[in-house]
Curated annotation (Swiss-Prot):
Gene giving rise to this polypeptide: pnp
Database matches in Pfam families: KH_1, PNPase, RNase_PH, RNase_PH_C, S1
UniProt GO molecular function: 3'-5'-RNA exonuclease activity; magnesium ion binding; polyribonucleotide nucleotidyltransferase activity; RNA binding
Ranges of compositional bias, category Basic and acidic residues: 700-714, 725-737
Family statement drawn from the similarity comment of this UniProt entry: Belongs to the polyribonucleotide nucleotidyltransferase family.
The enzyme's E.C. designation: 2.7.7.8
Swiss-Prot/TrEMBL GO biological process terms: mRNA catabolic process; RNA processing
Record protein name field: Polyribonucleotide nucleotidyltransferase
Cellular localization per UniProt: Cytoplasm
Segments forming domain KH: 556-615
Requisite cofactors: Mg(2+)
Region Disordered, annotated ranges: 691-737
């Protein structure tokens, strides 16, 4: 295929697509240039159907550091495992693509996005999402696209599509919305307590922009798209299906309607084991035994799927007996753990999360070094999902994509209400341990996180609660579910998570298994979620009505002072000598950022106060007209040098020592004397002149002796010592220092 170039303008930036030049052995490949961001996307499909009961789709987003003109960090100086941001971007692309493959499609598909050049003002993740859809659409892979996604901001009351970096920093909204030309099928958002109305407007305007990108893709597909390959889809034997349904559907229906999760799972497993045993015996010697038993398992799964949906849509009854808008029983506990800096245990039905708070100095912030400029991350929310939470064994190790994604969602939800660094100079880490799970564990972790923050004395603006909404749709009719449990998530069409305060939404996340949902469904889901959110907030606020006024006794005490940026080097000293001396003397730890914020922390408040005193002295500046109790440290013929404070000295010229003339400095002061002085001048080089006589009363006019002549006896200041008269010295040096 010869190289072809397609070009348009989108959101104020040039969007160029190139095909037929690179990665030509992939099933489909494109180079997408958006602004000066360039992403290569290649899509490949395996030749045969994979084994297993799921669709093996893998989406990768690779950040090459050369794209931003940077070296990778670390000793190896080579890209390694994906960053958290890259992992989240890969998930963001995967989620709207996955529903666009046919039911029963089991061939392995890989979509690899490589960022080749990076423009911080032209979204590389959105270029990668566009490229992923387009590479699949022009290939022979049976993909029912295209889809597209955009980022949406909200600045000064205006919706902005694909905001620049500067606009994103000012935005009250960080939203990614994706979908087909007919409907939205993926949402990811953080927001600063925005209303449901603003969020809905942003979603719909985002979808309008998505339609523009899809129209551009359709133009390209019409020009260079390949004919789709014929692939085998997983399907079950119709006669076998009818036979099993007739014999066992009634038993399975009864099992599904058991309300308690573990009892229901046990009851359904009994039916499945019974059916499996019957057909293992019946077809033990059949040459297609494996295929038949695979069909049996798939048929049983489909029967359970159908019964859950029938209960909700026809009988308006959920598997656990709740109404469609009813929340499971709630419980909230604070101070579950001793010694830690804060803890909260939140339970919703059979979903339970423990959140643990840790506070630390700003030196513990996470340094993020990606394609953007390096920055420090102050707040971290980590989510752990051990297999025992669902009563199973399984993989145990580093967090996977799902755990990273759920942690990031909770982080976005809670970050919006955290105090500023000036209000609360701590690094903050929350760890959510899912102890039980029957759906919506990520939202339970948000509720538990709120409890831990409030119990730990972190002055959040308002409590945050989260709820997961579900959907059962047959194409014509639909039912929106509040607080979905695991079974409803597994067999339902939507998982729509909404978190926020009483004043507005702080985070959204939506994934669906159908090809899109309408504005009507979104509106209803947001309204039901708001009602549920308020119910949960009632429970949280009843447990802990307000943020604790003090930190936990085990939390580090931190105090901060602000110094001028040009004084940082004074506090640090040559090779860190000064700051190391302060730390050794006081036993504190000290962090100084590039803006001059000095954080001092210790378990001993007296040590913090002493360190603050030392640092304040180091950066203190003398000011004209200020008075100091100074110590004489050096004497010269022309005056005395006095130490005002720390390393700041001033010159008291001999003429500024007394109102009467004196010939010798030593007649008035000696080294080690303490005298009161007033700063009278600071020159452009920072040299300080001070005066003693400015603080002394001016003497009266000299009295006359009996002969009518003035007395030559000088007026002696109170601190002047008796000395024999010495030869007068009147020379004044050119440089007083």
């Amino acid at each position: 295929m010869a190289k072809q170039v397609f070009q348009t303008t989108f959101a104020g930036r040039e969007l160029i697509v190139e095909t037929g030049q690179v990665a030509k052995q992939a099933n489909g490949s494109v180079v997408v240039r958006y602004g000066e961001s360039t992403v290569l996307t290649a899509a490949v499909m395996s030749k045969k159907m994979a084994t297993g009961d799921f669709f093996p789709l893998q989406v990768n987003y690779e950040e090459k550091m050369y794209a931003a003109g940077k070296f990778p960090g670390g000793f190896m100086k080579r890209e390694g495992r994906p960053s958290t941001d890259a992992t989240l971007t890969a998930r963001l692309i995967d989620r709207p693509i996955r529903p666009m493959f046919a039911e029963g499609f089991r061939n392995e598909v890989q979509v690899i996005n490589t960022v080749l050049s990076y423009d911080e003002n032209a979204s590389a993740p959105m270029a990668a999402m566009f490229g992923s859809s387009l590479a699949l659409s022009i290939s022979d892979i049976p993909f029912d696209g295209p889809i597209a996604g955009v980022q949406v901001g909200y600045v000064d009351g205006q919706i902005i599509i694909n905001p620049s970096q500067e606009q994103a920093e000012q935005s009250l909204l960080e939203l990614t919305v994706a979908g087909t030309k007919h409907a939205i099928n993926m949402v990811e958002s953080g927001a600063k307590e925005l209303s449901e109305e603003i969020m809905l407007e942003a979603l719909l305007k985002g979808h309008e922009a998505v339609k523009e990108l899809i129209a551009f893709q359709e133009e390209i597909v019409a020009a260079v798209g390949k004919e789709k390959a014929e692939v085998e889809l997983l399907h079950v034997d119709a006669e076998l299906q009818a036979e099993i349904i007739a014999a066992y559907n009634s038993d399975l229906q009864k099992a599904v309607q058991v309300e308690e999760k573990l009892a229901r799972e046990a009851a359904t497993q009994v039916v499945k084991d019974q059916v499996t045993a019957v057909y293992e015996e019946k077809y033990a010697d059949h040459e297609e035994f494996d295929r038949i038993m695979r069909d049996v398992a798939e048929i049983l799964e489909q029967m359970e799927h159908a019964e859950v949906r029938r209960l909700i849509t026809e009988d308006k009854v959920r598997p656990d007996g709740r109404k469609v808008d009813e929340i499971r029983p709630l419980d909230a506990v604070v101070d579950f753990l001793p010694r830690v800096h804060g803890s909260g245990l939140f339970t919703r039905g059979q979903t339970q999360a423990l959140s643990v708070l840790t506070l630390a100095p700003m030196g513990e912030t996470q340094i993020i070094d990606g394609l953007d400029l390096e920055y420090k991350k102050r707040f971290m929310h980590h989510y752990n999902f051990p297999q025992y939470s669902v009563g199973e064994t399984g993989r145990y190790g580093a967090p996977g994509r799902r755990e990273i994604g759920h942690g990031a969602l909770g982080e976005r939800a809670l970050a919006q209400v955290l105090p500023s660094l000036e209000e609360f100079p701590y690094a903050i880490r929350l760890v959510a341990e899912v102890l039980e799970s029957n759906g919506s564990s990520s939202q339970a972790s948000i509720c538990a996180g709120t409890l831990a923050l409030m119990a730990g004395g972190v002055p959040i603006k308002a409590p945050v609660a989260g709820i997961a909404m579900g959907l059962i749709s047959d194409g014509n009719n639909y039912t929106v579910l509040t607080d979905i449990q695991g079974l409803e998530d597994h067999f339902g069409d939507m998982d729509f998570k909404v978190a926020g305060t009483r004043d507005g939404i702080t985070a959204l996340q939506m994934d669906i298994k159908i090809q899109g949902i309408t504005a009507e469904i979104l509106t209803e889901a947001l309204a039901q979620a708001k009602k549920a959110r308020f119910e949960i907030l009632d429970v949280i606020e009843a447990t802990i009505p307000e943020v604790r006024p003090e930190l936990a006794p085990t939390a580090p005490k931190i105090d901060t002072i602000k110094i001028d940026v040009d004084k940082i080097k004074i506090v640090i000293g040559k090779g860190g000598e000064t700051i190391d001396k302060i730390i050794a003397e006081t036993g504190v730890k000290i962090d100084i950022d590039e803006e001059g914020n000095v954080s001092i922390y210790s378990s001993d408040q007296d040590a913090i106060n002493r360190a603050k005193e030392i640092i304040a002295g180091l950066v203190r500046e003398a000011k004209v007209d200020e008075v100091y109790r100074a110590k004489v440290v050096r004497i010269e013929k022309f005056g005395a040098f006095v130490n005002l404070f720390d390393k700041t000295d001033a010159l008291v010229h001999i003429s500024e020592m007394a109102w009467t003339r004196t010939n010798r400095v030593e007649d008035l002061v000696e080294i080690g004397d303490e005298v009161d002085v007033k700063v009278i001048k600071i020159d452009e080089k920072g040299r300080i002149d001070a005066s003693m006589k400015a603080l002394l009363p001016r003497p009266p006019k000299p009295e006359h002796d009996e002969k009518g002549e003035k007395s030559e006896r000088p007026h002696r200041p109170r601190h002047q010592k008796d000395h024999k008269p010495k030869k007068e010295f009147t020379e004044t040096p050119k440089d007083s220092e």
